[in-house]
Amino acid sequence: MTSAVTGVLRELATLFGAWGAEDARTAETITITPADLAEDDAFNRLALRIHAVQRMSNPMLRRFWDGASGAEPASWREIPPIPVMAFRDVPIVCGTPEAVFRTSGTSGGRGGRGEHHVPSLDLYRATARGNYRRHLLRGVRRIRMVSLIPDPVVVTDSSLARMAGFIADEPEVAETVWAFDPVTGVDVDSVRDAARGTDPVLLLTTAFSLVHLLDALGSGRLPLPPGSRIMETGGFKGRVAEVDRGALQARVDRTLAVGTSCIVNEYGMTELLSQAYDGVAGGGPADAGATGTDENGAHGGEPRPGSPVPRCHRFPPWVRTRALDPATLSPLPPGQPGLLCHFDLANA
């Protein structure tokens, strides 16, 4: 790994790790704060710097960008995006990866599983930590974590499992119960034991594991202790019948006594190092500090008068998301459906 790559990875880990800290400038080399990245000028300068390092360090990326454009970009908007399918065909990394995370895909190259070669786990932890602390652990002093996401010691190539491991390391987490096995599935008895305690529970789960838990509990109720909250992520991936999100949350409220305001949806992809959340556990929209979600400004649209405020996913300020025309990759106006293009500075 070149010194340029090592340097930029270290700087990004310091910068992103400072998000939400009292003193965001934690190193002399950091001349901007995470909040500055909400402004296009600061975001653009850092994006172009990362692009230059990647172009210099990865011949495959250099050939791709030369073939797609050829011109030196003057703005991050001019950098040709990497298609998701590329993660199934070639390793996209600058230097030697510390970890390789794999998707759960079932078709395509290399067995259909995309691979994200991550050069720095410190960067991944720094990227994830401020975000999940803001949205899942705000106001928490002590909590028990019950994970229906696999233990990262058991499933080593899952970015989601690794993030669950990061959360388990937080000082507020008094105990962690790994209640999902890739072979046997959800450990309902472990969830029952957690419900009998007095500490509030942070339940981390995929959507299909949550449905399996509710199905196993049947018509019975298993109220979690007051202050409990749930992070739900992912779709159903064909493992269970699709369930309307509103109906699922109502069922959770009836069975686990966790209201909608304490159920937070996390949006992530193996191909991205950053995550988006649609609310703060305990009430409130996704953190206002996460302003980089939609470069076009269409955060789900404006609510009609008298209607509830829509819950919209927000990334941290080092991510921009654009809706592009699938045929031309030209940006679309606000409100138009298109191909989502995430520009994540953590994908260095």
Task: Place the predicted regions along the sequence by residue.
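Long, hydrophobic, well-ordered secondary-structure blocks that form the structural core
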Residues: 114-157, 161-174
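Active-site diphosphate/adenylate-binding microenvironment
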Residues: 41, 53-102, 110-117, 130-139
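The conserved Walker
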Residues: 107
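Short, hydrophobic/amphipathic alpha-helical packing segments
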Residues: 58, 125, 129, 207-210
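Active-site glycine/GP-rich loop and adjacent strand/helix microenvironment
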Residues: 2-19, 41-53, 142-144, 151, ...
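Anionic, Ser/Thr-rich low-complexity intrinsically disordered regions
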Residues: 5-20, 24-30, 34-39, 81-83
